[in-house]
């Protein structure tokens, strides 16, 4: 989104940028809604895919299915927040876009403290997505990028955006296939294996989150 939006801003001005962003958001929201709804509807099948080792432990499996259903709409809110970040970065407003992801920990920790239940963690993840969208809204309103979404798959600039997204989607797809296989394997290893893997992954991702994402966002055109 950022390169195409920046190009429109540079070549045609702010109004053209706003018009493109409204269409990009409209198309993206359609995709995000479809993915989120399918995830909720097929949560049981997805849980069997990536946590098949829990099937024989009925209470744990049912809790995992419930948590999957609760968390899947996070994709919608996270995608919406990512679009907001793109607009803010393109308009050189980096502070809010950089701060919003920090709410991830706030949502999870806050929910866990307020509600002592495993489901609280899933609710916290969902709350994080909502908070990220809300946190960006004032900044987006200040720059005038709160126009209602427009669905237009035929717009040439939207098509350019989708063409740019496809290679990245393929690359991320490889990563997530590996993640699903790892989760499936870990579900067979007994209590705590999933948590150990998550903590190790977060430790590995820490430098990327602090340095790589910040630098890459600032160097985008």
Residue map of PLM features:
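Membrane-embedded alpha-helical bundles of multi-pass transporters/translocases
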Residues: 1-221
